[in-house]
Amino acid sequence: MSTMLIAVILLTLLALFFGVLLGFAALKFKVEGNPIVDELEAILPQTQCGQCGYPGCRPYAEAIANGDKVNKCPPGGTATMEKLANLMGVEPEPLNAEAQSQVKKVAYIREDECIGCTKCIQACPVDAIIGAGKLMHTVLTADCTGCDLCVEPCPVDCIDMIPVGQNLKNWNWRLNAIPVTLIQETPHEEKRG
């Protein structure tokens, strides 16, 4: 046999041995996760924004499982908070007062200063920044959660967080709709006389 064939066979056997060893170690030393944390994390919006005071959705889910409040997720809103409260069996509370009092902000890239490094795109957890390498980037304001994670990695500091004012484009018309009460028609009684 040639030395090349011996080397290939030897490497294949070595890879097979270590593969079996790793498979055994994975089964023997398997760490069971907390299933309630997995369920809580599935409910959270996965923006990894840190507005709750934790570095991501998984740590916040672990904190909720350990008894922290369920009302600290501004991107998730009231619907997420109610689902979390239902799962944990606690009373729903209004969203965190700090989160509600803050004006919603979105990222704004000063495109004339942008060098197209793509670091902000990589940092954005919701893909709200579009652009390509060596070209200017821009933010899709409808998708931006205002998490502020894109500001720090920018090497030329061309990203600002600006407050979003209400205008015709972002006004929630259904929220401020005029209440309408439907009246059921009743058969009229015939006039006598």
Swiss-Prot record:
Domain 4Fe-4S ferredoxin-type per the UniProt entry, residue ranges: 105-134, 136-164
Top EC category: translocase
Cofactor note: Binds 3 [4Fe-4S] clusters.
Any one biological process term the GO annotation gives: electron transport chain
Gene3D superfamilies assigned: 3.30.70.20, Electron transport complex subunit B, putative Fe-S cluster (1.10.15.40)
E.C. code: 7.-.-.-
Binding-site list for [4Fe-4S] cluster 2: C114, C117, C120, C154
Keywords: 4Fe-4S, Cell inner membrane, Cell membrane, Electron transport, Iron, Iron-sulfur, Membrane, Metal-binding, Repeat, Translocase, Transport
Cellular component, GO, one term: plasma membrane
Subcellular location: Cell inner membrane
Binding partners and assembly: The complex is composed of six subunits: RnfA, RnfB, RnfC, RnfD, RnfE and RnfG.
Family as reported in the entry's similarity comment: Belongs to the 4Fe4S bacterial-type ferredoxin family. RnfB subfamily.
Protein name (database record): Ion-translocating oxidoreductase complex subunit B
Species this protein is from: Shewanella sp. (strain ANA-3)
Name of encoding gene: rnfB
